[in-house]
Amino acid sequence: MPPKTRSGARRGGRRVVKKNVAAGHAYIKSTFNNTIVSITDPHGAVISWASSGHVGFKGSRKSTPFAAQMAAENAARKAMDHGMKKVDVFVKGPGSGRETAIRSLQAAGLEVSSITDATPQPHNGCRPTKRRKV
């Protein structure tokens, strides 16, 4: 009996489907502890993402601007493999990696057409965290 042949994906792995998307949105969520960059198509389907922890930083190093830069470059590189050229950037949160992440998206080769600050503002909602005693 002849051996069975496999067609399609390799065993146990995921098949990477190349999407051909020219423009999309980049969402940068920058908290005090981490920075997460998600790049989507115009409909909101995620094409690529990266975070400071995903790139390899641990602990307090995740909150640095350099970690945000590496995460944004990683996400931009993956998105450009799918044909992405132009992004609208939406920034959320008070973290230290906001501006660095935007600059590294541009440096990676993506054309940034607009930057929007989408940080949620409470209308006297949850109580904020207490002041640090250093």
From Swiss-Prot:
Q: Name one GO biological process term.
A: translation
InterPro entries (UniProt xref): Ribosomal_uS11, Ribosomal_uS11_bac-type, Ribosomal_uS11_CS, Ribosomal_uS11_sf
Q: Which gene encodes it?
A: rpsK
User: What name is this protein filed under?
Assistant: Small ribosomal subunit protein uS11
Q: Does the keyword RNA-binding apply?
A: yes
Q: Which GO terms describe its cellular component?
A: ribonucleoprotein complex; ribosome
Please indicate which superkingdom the organism of origin belongs to.
Answer: Bacteria
One Pfam family in the UniProt entry: Ribosomal_S11
Q: Which UniProt keywords apply?
A: Ribonucleoprotein, Ribosomal protein, RNA-binding, rRNA-binding
Q: What does this gene product do?
A: Located on the platform of the 30S subunit, it bridges several disparate RNA helices of the 16S rRNA. Forms part of the Shine-Dalgarno cleft in the 70S ribosome.
Q: For bias kind Polar residues, which ranges apply?
A: 113-122
Q: Name one GO molecular function term.
A: rRNA binding
**Quaternary structure note:** Part of the 30S ribosomal subunit. Interacts with proteins S7 and S18. Binds to IF-3.
For whether the record's keyword set contains Iron, the answer is: no
Gene3D superfamilies for this protein: Ribosomal protein S11
Sequence segments annotated as region (Disordered)? 113-134
Q: Which family does it belong to?
A: Belongs to the universal ribosomal protein uS11 family.
Q: Which HAMAP family match?
A: Ribosomal_uS11
Task: Name the species this protein comes from.
Answer: Corynebacterium aurimucosum (strain ATCC 700975 / DSM 44827 / CIP 107346 / CN-1) (Corynebacterium nigricans)
